[in-house]
Amino acid sequence: MSPRVGRVERTTKETSVLVEINLDGTGKVDVATGVGFYDHMLDQLGRHGLFDLTVKTEGDLHIDTHHTIEDTALALGAAFKQALGDKVGIYRFGNCTVPLDESLAQVTVDLSGRPYLVHTEPENMAPMIGTYDTTMTRHIFESFVAQAQIALHIHVPYGRNAHHIVECQFKALARALRYASEHDPRAAGILPSTKGAL
């Protein structure tokens, strides 16, 4: 079986983004967005999902980080969808709960072909982690879901440290996506849908 790879290049007046993802990789990551904490989160996604992930983004960081973060997430979602292909033989559903010290993230995904996000995290988080605006976390997932066309539920019932709260979400997402996108040996050649389409 050939590796499932997606590659997307997205260029606007605000950003230039290249994303390549191999769903059947070993967690090799090469990421550079110009936003240090975001790079750290994308590294978690690749390593814990065992996806080979390349991300190269040049954006209008002289304004702020919004366009860079958003457009990278859009391209990542599109590349993930491309890599999934016809979805024949995959598990389709995946979930994972990940602690990071005092914080906990619960993530469930359905590779359904229908974009939907439910996202909750503790209120009154620190507004910034380095140059990363913590209000962008939800927007990253919104952008990713819109292009990947998946249903994604993320719940962080508790946590104090903003870094930990965000990081455990990316780690749990990585594992949930890995489990959902892996091939089920009992369902070879079968599309996991009663309606015959995903």
From Swiss-Prot:
Question: PROSITE patterns, alphabetically?
Answer: IGP_DEHYDRATASE_1 (PS00954), IGP_DEHYDRATASE_2 (PS00955)
Pathway(s) per entry: Amino-acid biosynthesis; L-histidine biosynthesis; L-histidine from 5-phospho-alpha-D-ribose 1-diphosphate: step 6/9
Main localization is cytoplasm
**Highest taxon in the source lineage:** Bacteria
Q: Which reaction does it catalyse?
A: D-erythro-1-(imidazol-4-yl)glycerol 3-phosphate = 3-(imidazol-4-yl)-2-oxopropyl phosphate + H2O
**Gene3D superfamilies, per database record:** Imidazole glycerol phosphate dehydratase, domain 1
GO CC aspect terms: cytoplasm
Location comes to:
Cytoplasm
GO MF: imidazoleglycerol-phosphate dehydratase activity
One Pfam match, by short name?
Answer: IGPD
Q: Which GO terms describe its biological process?
A: L-histidine biosynthetic process
**EC number assigned by the record:** 4.2.1.19
Q: Which UniProt keywords apply?
A: Amino-acid biosynthesis, Cytoplasm, Histidine biosynthesis, Lyase
Q: Which family does it belong to?
A: Belongs to the imidazoleglycerol-phosphate dehydratase family.
Question: How is this protein named in the record?
Answer: Imidazoleglycerol-phosphate dehydratase
Q: Taxonomic classification, please?
A: Bacteria, Bacillati, Actinomycetota, Actinomycetes, Kitasatosporales
The UniProt gene name for this protein comes to: hisB
